[in-house]
């Protein structure tokens, strides 16, 4: 089946964020998986309604409980999976490469990110992985991109500048395994322009992640 523009933007934007694709056939077929903590249940159901045509008739979002070793607490989460779909391989080929050393698929920013980073895709990307930097102190925002390669993160930076004239900086972050990652910082000077690009496509329950221009949130 062909995808609508909203479905394409949701998939692309959320693959830059929390979304992922899974394969059990050595990359021949793929399914999309969305997973969010219980506080974001409404947002997960928003994703489900858009991608429902890709899901099985009996597929519904499901709640699960996992133990978080970092906090020694149980965490409630909601998730859903689509069925495998030929349209998803297009995105998998952009985002994923197979690492022979680890025997795992690795996700990174597509080389052609600029081609697909529409305002709506950017909104989903930010909703998934963005946050205010200092609520009540600054209008600056940030996007947690440290899981990507430095080159991939720079590709996002260049796309934001070329497409929307939004200047950003990179902040170094040390990951749990000791590797260095890079988080995209959206300074105050760029926050207004960034907000105007994504504002028409924000999901109501996630608007609080975006600066209102007065050091608060929408």
From Swiss-Prot:
SUPFAM superfamilies linked: Homing endonucleases
GO MF terms held by the record: endonuclease activity
Subcellular location: Plastid, Chloroplast
GO cellular component assignments: chloroplast
EC number(s) given by UniProt: 3.1.-.-
Main location: plastid
GO biological process, alphabetically ordered: intron homing
UniProt function note: Probable endonuclease involved in intron homing. Encoded in the group-I intron of the subunit rRNA-encoding gene (rrnL), it generates a staggered cut with 4-nt (CTCG) 3'-OH overhangs 2 bp downstream from the intron insertion site.
Similarity comment text for this entry: Belongs to the LAGLIDADG endonuclease family.
Protein name, per record: DNA endonuclease I-ChuI
Source organism: Chlamydomonas applanata
